[in-house]
Design a protein with these regions (language model features):
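Short, small-residue-biased leader/transition segments that mark boundaries at the very start
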Residues: 1-7
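Membrane-interface transmembrane helices that cradle and orient dolichyl/undecaprenyl
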Residues: 15-30
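Membrane-interface alpha helices of multi-pass inner-membrane proteins
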Residues: 30-47
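Perimembrane helix-loop-helix junctions
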Residues: 52-76
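Membrane-lumen/periplasm interface segments of specific transmembrane helices
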Residues: 71-106
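Juxtamembrane membrane-water interface segments that cap and precede transmembrane helices
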Residues: 99-122, 135-139
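Membrane-interface helix-loop-helix junctions at transmembrane boundaries of multi-pass membrane enzymes
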Residues: 136-160
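Hydrophobic/aromatic-rich transmembrane helices and adjacent perimembrane loops
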Residues: 175-193
């Protein structure tokens, strides 16, 4: 249900929070432990979150928080929810519960088969892609105006958003699960653009983006009603 869908999103947000906290920390093991603990917990319900653990390690390296000790902390954090799941599954003789996330992770749908996406999903993806290109370009061009830490965080969000777009193209069947995560990272980038720019071009783009958002909302509602 809605709660099951919301849990991976919450774990995703908490994981990002602790990853950000690890920025240039000499003792980052605890932060990376919690960051990967949430990724691991979320991946039990949505196994594709596991893919982000690879990106997280790369970003931790860029944040200068990845050492052998913090890597071990991350590894322990990610495996802990699975040890708990294994204990539950073994005790109640329901080992299929433990195997399920790994089977889901290994099961790929039709790669690049975007035809399976609903019209509202394609429209939403197109809208988010345009916003991403504009906001990412602004971050790259005007990045010198931000603090070094802020630039690192924004680059992380660009990487995550790009990673999500690639995942959706590779696994279109997971689009409905990946879209909320895409909206989170994209909304922060576009918010950064609108807050820090105040000229005629950005104002026009803001108005156009808002009008398109209203039209997109109307289209999504119309599509939903039509399908019923």
């Amino acid at each position: 249900g809605v709660q099951t869908c919301a849990l991976p999103i919450l774990t995703f947000l908490f994981s990002i929070y602790f990853l950000f906290k690890s920025y240039q920390q000499a003792q980052a093991s605890g932060y990376l432990f919690y960051s990967f603990l949430f990724i691991g917990a979320g991946s039990i319900l949505f196994p594709q979150l596991t893919f982000f653990s690879v990106l997280w390690l790369f970003e931790a390296h860029r944040f200068q928080s990845l050492t052998f000790r913090s890597f071990c902390g991350a590894l322990i954090g990610w495996t802990m929810p699975y040890w708990m799941l294994f204990g539950h599954a073994f005790f109640y003789d329901q080992m299929e519960l433990f195997y399920h996330p790994f089977k889901e992770l290994a099961t790929f749908g039709d790669i690049f088969n975007l035809q399976i996406l609903q019209p509202w999903e394609l429209a939403t993806l197109g809208y988010l892609l345009v916003l991403f290109i504009v906001s990412a370009a602004h971050c790259v061009v005007a990045g010198f105006e931000d603090k070094i830490r802020t630039r690192a965080y924004l680059q992380f969000l660009i990487d995550v958003t790009l990673f999500l777009f690639v995942l959706i193209v590779l696994q279109p069947s997971q689009c409905s699960n990946l879209l909320p995560l895409l909206m989170i990272s994209n909304s922060i980038l576009i918010g950064h653009l609108f807050v820090l720019t105040n000229n005629k071009t950005s104002n026009i783009f803001f108005i156009v983006a808002t009008v398109c958002l209203i039209l997109l909302f109307g289209f999504n509602v119309w599509t939903l009603l039509r399908s019923e």
